[in-house]
């Protein structure tokens, strides 16, 4: 009842019973009762009750008149507080809002029906509450509105509050006494409000009961724990039961168990866990009989067989000869259905995997019961000591045990699948957990900026499409910005987009450009129904991160005569386009579209029937995104997945991942996230892990040696000063890292690429690679090869600590294999590794350092790196091998004429250009990187697991979680990573794609590209040559590159190849060749800055600057002078005396750059300079001592500097052992290796000509002197000794010098004249091996080579391969002249046989002397094999040589020289002596022409041992 319905105002106008009696209406009522109107049909008692009700509740009908005391108070209040009435009205408005909220709640609760279609505990609860709950809101609202109206009326009438009598008629003014909602509510007697006193009392009682109950439970548990128990198992009966159980177990079948290697060893490879493909078997694993499913009876004796599943009770009647595989498939399906319905569990199936077969003849005879269980090939047979075998038939149903006859009544009744089943009703529960992240991750935020108007809305991504509202494109002439979980993209012109409206609905489908990464296509769409409960799913695109949001659920109802449906979920402006999702099945029902003007109802556009098949999943849309090969399901990951993907065993991490807001307890120290606070655009924070900025620089500072040298040498300082200061230490600070990382935050421009031409460019590049010899690549799964290619000095990863060298220090081969397998599994499953971001500590140009620009490095973690190398290493290695043959230089060496080949590959007379690219790694779009993935997949072997790994790897490369130094894990959406396994190769391919795309866009056919443009790429470096007729190409390249997002300029054009800069080098002409040269300033920076930790490292750095300076003659001369000065300082002079100071001769540098040998003329000129100061009286009586002492006036020639000092620099050598002083030899044979850095000595009293085995002759000339001729850089420059700096003089006394040759030699003479030419002897230093008679002369060796090549009928190139195999075969089997038959060489896994006879027929003098020519190479080959793993030739194994350091000498054609160590010489001689012991060489064979008929005069008795031996009492006779 509504108390406001009680009449009050006009009651005084009602006629009383007394008045009615006067008018003739006789009423049996009290005269004072008033009747509103008289109707004779109404009973009199009703009039009486109405009046009694009015009288009893007249106070409830309104506010009534105010008593005089209250009126005075109110009047005083109104006079003193002018804001009392507005404040009271504000309180009444608040109460009205509260009551209307309650009223909406009651209406929503009562709108839920408990029908059969919506029967749940929730609906039952709501129905009960709606039945018993009382709604006072309507009455309260009426009271509040009346009070508010009366107050406003009083205010509008402007009544003077000083007259209390005027106030008494306004009862609502009682509210001005109260200043709170509770006070006003109590004054107006509003119903349905909480009684806080009663609530407090009930809560106190409940807490007391809860505490008492907890105490009772605790007391019960405490008493239970104190209760004493005893074991009852150790008694006779229990022991008897255990014996019975053991006996029962003994009757069970037994199975052979072992690891793969053991099983393969005993039974064959078919029993390993590789799979059930047929493999080799051996021993008991080989079976001669056929596999049968039934045995011991004839199935044809029975009419049919009934198969029974003991778990489900289902039966199947079939022919006795039915294929058992079909039966097994049938019952597997039945059991899967039961599993899905939770009627059985997997444990049931594991404990009872078999079925039972009943072979039945007729219904009156006994049936044959047979147990069928899955076949186990390793089960031990019951009757024989062997295994069951047949591993290819594993898990197939087969008879187990002997068949048993059973009575007909024991046969189960038929229970075929599909019979009618009746199930019990179960209670309906609330719906369980549901993951809405797949929907939230597909939501995009769309901004359409057209002129000055900007519209913001949401959309839903599906493949290459976005579904959104049509009213987004009220204007379609602007720029569309798309913010998604893929990143931030920009479409410059919305008119280029293809749009498909959904007829009659506020829905439109946008087809994205082809270079937009596709979304996952896992969403489900359907039409809504009235029974659905819906929620609103959204994504909160913040500046620094993206998070998912979800609303409460709401009912939904259709709007008449439209395709809109209404919902009651609160929304805001800009929420249009968010998906409405059904909580019943997770399907998307529509997109939020409209709201009414009062924001009390919202509307969404519903999807039509078959929306997905009609508009989304058609063939045209599938073809639109088919070129995308990366995994779209692994793109929209966030913090939750990152924590789930934390590496597990065998990887061991030492840092934990946390959420961004996961720190509930913290120290009150100020923590600044200096990077996270600046994130924007395509960089989003997804997590946190401990990190710090490494500011320790590898460059320690300025080199004090170099500074001291310049301070003490003014002329040299004038030379070096202009070249110094151009390079500085890179800045390692927070701002530098933020500046470099924020390059990745720029939006990705899509729609600018001509995708048709770009896809054509990909096909052209693939065809080019095939034509150049690029073949199929493999996935490298060999752990040894993977680990050998790792940089063990690098860090393990962001979540790890230490270097790889320490992490894998004690790891076995099996553990390494497990690491590779685990990494591949993570990659296959799409688990992300956390990459480490850091700043590069290096020398950078001064301008970039002043601008605080430092390059960052993003390193792959070990858990991703190993699997990544499995996928990319073989492709990369083949890529390196084709350098310069294809348009790239990756893998080439700039030395040995490599740079000359590069520049000469650019045609002469063309227009050249070195393109300048900037911000390359951060500007690469996902579309470009996906093209690289397509190229790689085109050449990889077919392996579905490998393809998935490779796709996931490149998905992780694009969408990378990077652990930054401030502790934030950042997700990027574009660009390449500098620390991924194939950065250079991928960058090179992308630049090649850009060049091919540009030429195709310019209209040139692929067959004409090389005729008009030649180019080479290395990473982001690009050098081009264009035919003069097509010079205009340069004007268009920048535009086409920018379409792909690449920032390149092509303005530095030239006609001179020497002006080209490529990879920071330019080519200068030297001795007819182009040699690579760095900037002089960059070379001087090596001297200027010190990063070495040991003195020897500093010397190596100076030598490195010498290598780079060759070609700058003046600079090289000054560096050699500096190096010579350094070797005189401590502690470098001690290193020099110990032979540890590296030194590089001029001839070595010439060989390194030009790959040309030093001429004998150059060497002779050096020797002439060495002996040019000998006097005439020494003409015949001269010997050579190596004291190297000179007169004061003699000139000293030093290869280290043009000025003479006492420091001597010998030539380069490949061995650390010097020749004896009594021997001065020069060996000119070619070595297998040619090192640059070699020991040098600075002892002033000894000069030795080392025994060199390099191809570089010794050099005694002054290197880099400006007076030398260009074509004879090793010419001798005679310089006078500076007597003021003579190390041989002390004070005014001169130390006497010995002559190099003395006249006291006794020479052989004829007729009193010496018969030897000492001048020739001084120059005659032949190689020791050339004179040795253990090596065949060169003419014999050449004759042998030609004869063998002719007999084998092969070419010189084929012969070079055969000789490799012959040398290795002879290392193993020796070079004995008694060998015969065939010798073998391996071609992969195949043996190739060659006859030995031609080798021996042409070998003069002996085959061993021929093979002595291969001694040096064989020694190096054995050393190489030992570097890979322990290797001992068969020759050493037979002699039981245990020292592997001597393995290089363990072959019988080893050639001993004076450089052979004494220990090695002794070991080789001992092995040779052991091999030749008891060997007999017969001078004559058996003469077949001599007669053998003669009389045998020997006499033997029965006591003789045999016919050739006499015996006398056990003793041998003579």
Curated annotation (Swiss-Prot):
Catalysed conversion reaction: Hydrolyzes glutaminyl bonds, and activity is further restricted by preferences for the amino acids in P6 - P1' that vary with the species of potyvirus, e.g. Glu-Xaa-Xaa-Tyr-Xaa-Gln-|-(Ser or Gly) for the enzyme from tobacco etch virus. The natural substrate is the viral polyprotein, but other proteins and oligopeptides containing the appropriate consensus sequence are also cleaved; RNA(n) + a ribonucleoside 5'-triphosphate = RNA(n+1) + diphosphate
Instruction: List, for all copies, the residue spans of the domain called Peptidase C4.
Output: 426-644
InterPro entries in the record: DNA/RNA_pol_sf, Peptidase_S1_PA, Peptidase_S1_PA_chymotrypsin, Poty_coat, Potyv_NIa-pro_dom, PP_Potyviridae, Rev_trsase/Diguanyl_cyclase, RNA-dir_pol_C
Place the motif Nuclear localization signal on the sequence.
273-280
Its keywords, alphabetically, are: Capsid protein, Covalent protein-RNA linkage, Host nucleus, Host-virus interaction, Hydrolase, Nucleotide-binding, Nucleotidyltransferase, Phosphoprotein, Protease, RNA-directed RNA polymerase, Thiol protease, Transferase, Viral RNA replication, Virion
Q: Where is the RdRp catalytic domain?
A: 910-1034
Q: Which cysteines are cross-linked by disulfides?
A: none
List the SUPFAM superfamilies hit by this protein, alphabetically.
Answer: DNA/RNA polymerases (SSF56672), Trypsin-like serine proteases (SSF50494)
Task: Give me the stretches of Low complexity compositional bias.
Answer: 1239-1258
**Where is region (Disordered) located?**
1239-1272
Question: Which EC numbers characterise this protein's activity in its record?
Answer: 3.6.4.-, 3.4.22.44, 2.7.7.48
Q: State the GO CC annotations.
A: host cell nucleus; viral capsid
- Site annotation (Cleavage) points to 179-180, 232-233, 425-426, 668-669, 1186-1187
An example GO BP is: proteolysis
Name the source's superkingdom: Viruses
What does UniProt list as catalytic? Answer: 471 (for nuclear inclusion protein a activity), 506 (for nuclear inclusion protein a activity), 576 (for nuclear inclusion protein a activity)
**A Pfam family of this chain:** Peptidase_C4
**Which protein is depicted?**
Genome polyprotein
């Amino acid at each position: 009842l509504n108390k406001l319905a009680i009449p009050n105002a006009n009651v005084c106008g009602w006629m009383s019973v007394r008045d009615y009696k006067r008018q003739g209406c006789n009423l049996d009522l009290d005269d004072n009762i008033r009747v509103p109107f008289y109707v004779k049909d109404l009973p009199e008692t009703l009039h009486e009750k109405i009046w009694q009700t009015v009288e009893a509740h007249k106070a409830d009908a309104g506010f009534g008149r105010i008593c005089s005391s209250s009126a005075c108070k109110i009047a005083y209040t109104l006079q003193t507080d002018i804001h009392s009435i507005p404040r009271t009205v504000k309180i009444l408005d608040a109460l009205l809002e509260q009551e209307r909220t309650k009223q909406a709640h009651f209406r929503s609760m009562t709108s839920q029906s408990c029908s059969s279609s919506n029967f749940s505990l929730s609906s039952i609860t709501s129905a009960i509450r709606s039945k018993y709950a009382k709604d006072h809101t309507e009455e309260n609202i009426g009271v509040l509105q009346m009070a508010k109206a009366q107050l406003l009326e009083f205010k509008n009438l402007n009544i003077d509050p000083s007259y209390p009598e005027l106030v008494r008629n306004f009862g609502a003014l009682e509210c001005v006494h109260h200043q709170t909602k509770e006070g006003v509510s109590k004054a107006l007697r509003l119903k349905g409000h909480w009684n806080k006193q009663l609530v407090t009392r009930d809560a106190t009682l409940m807490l007391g009961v809860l505490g008492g109950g907890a105490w009772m439970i605790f007391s019960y548990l405490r008493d239970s724990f104190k209760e004493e128990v005893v074991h009852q198992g150790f008694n006779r009966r229990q022991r008897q039961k255990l014996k019975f159980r053991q006996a029962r177990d003994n009757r069970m079948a037994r199975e052979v168990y072992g690891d793969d290697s053991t099983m393969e060893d005993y039974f064959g490879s078919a029993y390993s866990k590789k799979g059930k493909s047929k493999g080799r078997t051996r021993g008991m694993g080989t079976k001669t009989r056929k596999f049968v499913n039934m045995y011991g009876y004839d199935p044809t004796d029975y009419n049919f067989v009934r198969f029974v599943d003991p778990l489900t009770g289902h039966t199947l009647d079939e022919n006795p000869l039915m294929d058992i595989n079909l039966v097994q498939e049938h019952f597997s399906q039945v059991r899967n259905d039961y599993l899905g319905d939770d009627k059985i569990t997997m444990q049931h199936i594991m404990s009872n995997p078999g079925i039972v077969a009943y072979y039945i003849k007729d219904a009156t005879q006994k049936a044959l019961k047979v147990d069928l269980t899955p076949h186990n090939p390793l089960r031990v047979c019951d009757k024989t000591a062997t295994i069951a075998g047949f591993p290819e038939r594993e898990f197939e149903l087969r008879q187990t045990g002997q068949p048993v006859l059973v009575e007909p009544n024991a046969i189960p009744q038929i229970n075929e699948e599909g019979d009618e089943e009746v199930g019990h009703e179960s209670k309906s529960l609330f719906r369980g957990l549901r993951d809405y992240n797949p929907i939230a991750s597909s939501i995009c935020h769309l901004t359409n900026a057209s002129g000055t108007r900007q519209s913001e809305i949401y959309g839903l991504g599906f493949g290459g499409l976005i579904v959104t509202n049509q009213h987004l494109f009220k204007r379609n002439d602007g720029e569309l910005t798309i913010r998604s979980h893929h990143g931030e993209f920009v479409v410059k012109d919305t008119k280029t987009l293809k749009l498909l409206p959904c007829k009659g609905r506020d829905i439109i489908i946008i087809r994205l450009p082809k270079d937009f990464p596709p979304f996952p296509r896992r969403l489900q769409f359907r039409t809504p129904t009235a029974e659905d409960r819906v929620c609103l799913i959204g994504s909160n695109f913040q500046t620094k991160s993206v998070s998912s949001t979800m609303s409460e659920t709401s009912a939904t109802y259709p709007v008449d005569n439209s395709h809109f449906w209404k919902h009651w979920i609160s929304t805001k402006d800009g929420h249009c386009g968010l998906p409405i999702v059904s909580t019943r099945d997770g399907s998307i029902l529509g997109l939020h579209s409209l709201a009414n003007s009062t924001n009390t109802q919202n509307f969404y556009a519903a999807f039509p029937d078959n929306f997905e098949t009609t508009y989304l999943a058609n063939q045209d849309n599938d073809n639109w995104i088919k070129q995308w090969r990366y995994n779209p399901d692994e793109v929209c990951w966030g913090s939750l997945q990152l924590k789930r993907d934390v590496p597990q065993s065998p990887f061991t991490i030492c840092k934990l991942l946390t959420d961004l807001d996961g720190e509930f307890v913290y120290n009150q120290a100020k923590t600044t996230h200096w990077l996270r606070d600046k994130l924007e655009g395509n960089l989003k924070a997804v997590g946190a892990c401990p990190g710090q900025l490494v500011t320790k620089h590898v460059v320690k500072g300025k080199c004090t040696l170099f500074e001291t040298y310049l301070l003490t040498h003014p002329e040299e300082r004038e030379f070096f000063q202009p070249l110094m200061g151009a390079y500085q230490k890179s800045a390692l600070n927070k701002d530098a890292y933020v500046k470099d990382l924020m390059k990745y935050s720029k939006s990705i421009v899509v729609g600018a690429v001509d995708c048709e031409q770009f896809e054509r460019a990909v096909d052209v590049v693939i065809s080019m690679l095939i034509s150049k010899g690029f073949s199929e690549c493999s996935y490298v799964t060999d752990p040894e090869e993977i680990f050998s290619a790792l940089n063990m000095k690098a860090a393990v990863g962001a979540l790890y600590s230490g270097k790889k060298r320490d992490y894998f220090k004690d790891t076995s081969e099996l553990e390494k294999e497990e690491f590779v397998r685990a990494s591949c599994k993570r990659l296959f499953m799409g688990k992300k590794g956390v990459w480490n971001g850091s700043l590069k500590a290096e020398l950078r140009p001064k301008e970039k350092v002043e601008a605080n620009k430092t390059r960052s490095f993003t390193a792959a973690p070990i858990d991703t790196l190993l699997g990544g190398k499995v996928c990319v290493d073989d492709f990369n290695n083949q890529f390196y091998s084709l350098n310069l043959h294809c348009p790239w230089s990756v893998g080439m060496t700039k030395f040995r004429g490599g740079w000359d080949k590069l520049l000469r590959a650019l045609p002469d007379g063309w227009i050249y250009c070195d393109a300048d690219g900037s911000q390359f790694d951060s500007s690469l779009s996902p579309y470009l990187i996906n093209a690289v993935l397509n190229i790689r997949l085109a050449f990889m072997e077919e392996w579905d697991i490998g393809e998935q790994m490779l796709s996931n790897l490149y998905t992780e490369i694009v969408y990378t979680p990077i652990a930054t130094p401030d502790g934030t894990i950042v997700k990027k959406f574009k660009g390449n990573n500098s620390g991924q396994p194939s950065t250079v190769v991928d960058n090179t391919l992308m630049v090649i794609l850009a060049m091919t795309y540009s030429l195709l866009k310019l209209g040139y056919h692929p067959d004409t590209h090389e005729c008009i443009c030649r180019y080479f790429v290395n990473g982001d470096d690009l050098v081009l040559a264009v035919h003069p007729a097509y010079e205009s190409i340069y004007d268009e390249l920048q535009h086409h590159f920018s379409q792909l997002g690449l920032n390149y300029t092509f303005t530095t054009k030239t006609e001179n190849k020497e002006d080209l800069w490529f990879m920071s080098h330019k080519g200068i002409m030297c001795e007819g060749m182009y040699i690579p040269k760095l900037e002089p300033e960059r070379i001087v920076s090596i001297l200027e800055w010190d990063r070495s930790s040991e003195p020897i490292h500093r010397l190596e750095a100076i030598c490195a600057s010498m290598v780079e300076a060759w070609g700058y003659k003046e600079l090289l001369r000054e560096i050699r002078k500096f190096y010579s000065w350094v070797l005189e300082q401590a502690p470098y002079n001690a290193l020099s005396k110990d032979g540890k100071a590296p030194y590089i001769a001029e001839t070595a540098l010439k060989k390194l750059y030009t790959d040309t040998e030093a001429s004998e003329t150059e060497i002779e000129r050096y020797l002439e300079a060495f002996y040019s100061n000998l006097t005439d009286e020494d003409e015949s009586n001269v010997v050579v001592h190596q004291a190297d002492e000179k007169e004061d006036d003699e000139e000293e020639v030093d290869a280290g500097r043009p000025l003479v000092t006492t420091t001597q620099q010998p030539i380069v050598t490949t061995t650390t052992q010097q020749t004896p002083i009594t021997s001065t030899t020069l060996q000119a044979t070619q070595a297998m290796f040619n090192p640059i850095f070699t020991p040098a000595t600075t002892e002033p009293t000894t000069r030795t000509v080392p025994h060199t085995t390099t191809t570089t002759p010794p050099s005694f000339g002054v290197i880099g002197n400006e007076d030398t001729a260009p074509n004879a850089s090793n010419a001798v420059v005679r310089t006078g000794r500076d007597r003021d700096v003579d190390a041989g003089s002390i004070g005014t006394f001169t130390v006497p010098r010995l002559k190099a040759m003395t006249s006291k030699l006794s020479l052989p003479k004829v007729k009193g004249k010496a018969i030897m030419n000492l001048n020739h002897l001084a120059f005659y230093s032949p190689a020791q091996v050339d004179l040795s008679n253990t090596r065949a002369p060169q003419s014999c060796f050449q004759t042998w080579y030609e004869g063998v090549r002719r007999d084998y009928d092969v070419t010189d190139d084929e012969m070079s391969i055969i000789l490799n195999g012959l040398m290795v075969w002879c290392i193993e089997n020796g070079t004995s002249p008694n060998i015969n038959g065939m010798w073998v060489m391996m071609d992969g896994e195949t043996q190739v046989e060659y006859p030995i006879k031609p080798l021996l027929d042409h070998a003069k003098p002996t085959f061993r002397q021929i093979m002595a020519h291969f001694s040096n190479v064989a020694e190096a080959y054995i050393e190489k094999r030992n570097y890979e793993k322990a290797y001992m030739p068969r020759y050493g194994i037979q002699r039981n040589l245990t020292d592997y350091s001597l393995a290089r000498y363990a072959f019988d054609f080893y050639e001993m020289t004076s450089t052979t160590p004494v220990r090695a010489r002794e070991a080789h001689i001992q092995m040779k002596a052991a091999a030749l012991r008891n060997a007999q060489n017969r001078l004559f064979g058996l003469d077949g022409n001599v007669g053998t008929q003669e009389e045998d005069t020997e006499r033997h008795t029965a006591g003789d041992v045999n016919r050739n031996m006499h015996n006398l009492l056990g003793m041998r006779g003579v």
